[in-house]
Amino acid sequence: MKPIKKISDVSFFRLFEGEAYYTTDGSNPFGMSLHSEEKLLVPDKVCLSQFFPLGDTMLFVKWKEPYTYELNLKTGVERVVRDEAVQAVSEQYINYRNTEKKTNSYVNRTSGTYYVLPYILWGFLPDGGIAEDDTEIFRVDQDGNILWSFPFVDLDEDNIYTPGEVDHIVKILGIVNDLLWFSTQFGRLVALDVATGKVVYQLSGNPADQGKVEYTQVAGLGDCFYRESDRSIVCISYLGFQVIDTSTGDLAESCVFLEEDPDGIGRFDYIYAPNLQGDYFTFLAEMKTDRYGIGRVGIFDLKARKLLWTEEIIPFEERKATRNHLVTSQPLYISGDKLYIKDVKDTLHIFQRE
């Protein structure tokens, strides 16, 4: 990997087909300019993160305006395409928000059909989807009727580290084999039957759950991801990774970094912000001797079980002199043949495969 570009004052970025699109304007956080890696696209008034590249066009929202704009990336022509503000884009749907009516529209990107709900959906189904609030996760149909709900109190508390506090969802991983998988704050992995909302599998790496018959005990789960290629759940911690078979709920594969790759990833004392991308995951790393914050990143090959690449992209001398460093809320991303990561001083670092 070779560094090819640094872009300063990047507030937020998205990746699409090997290129970064980003907003920037440190003096006006609510009316930013929108850029590609090569040029300025929209000079001002773009909301921080409400922009979504879609092939030759870009959907975006302007500050204090209830509309969705479309920008033709080839011609530069900009126009209003909807009187609702775009909120999210997935492979299946585009989500728009009507702030006056407080409703969410979900438009199927293939058929153009849509439905309107008072809920924000985190998972999509042919007749509705999965939503959540502060106390429960539930399934709704396209008319907004709740078909079932699963209260978070049923997850139980953590009576060792946070007694009395109810567990909650950290990440909804996806719907696989008619099961809704999600990970929780207290280190649990849960699968619910999407038809009934009943628990099918519960795994835990939390010491508080040892001895609880309802949980299958595994090593610490860390950060969990859905892997499309084999429809599995991959869980990555600073110690190693585990692969869960979603058809059985069993542990299909595990790896301890210090045993499998002692001279590669195993030599790091701390692994942060793992980010699964296909058969690889990227990460931030530190050793006990490091000072002045995180400066190193790496890529690990899950199939080969070895470190592919690592580099200290913010050297010790720079961290000491400027207090610049990497942060766990900004992981390393792969897009095409490039790598992207943003440091604490809002500089976007771009690398390319040699």
Range-by-range predicted roles:
Residues 1-354:
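Secretory-pathway ectodomains
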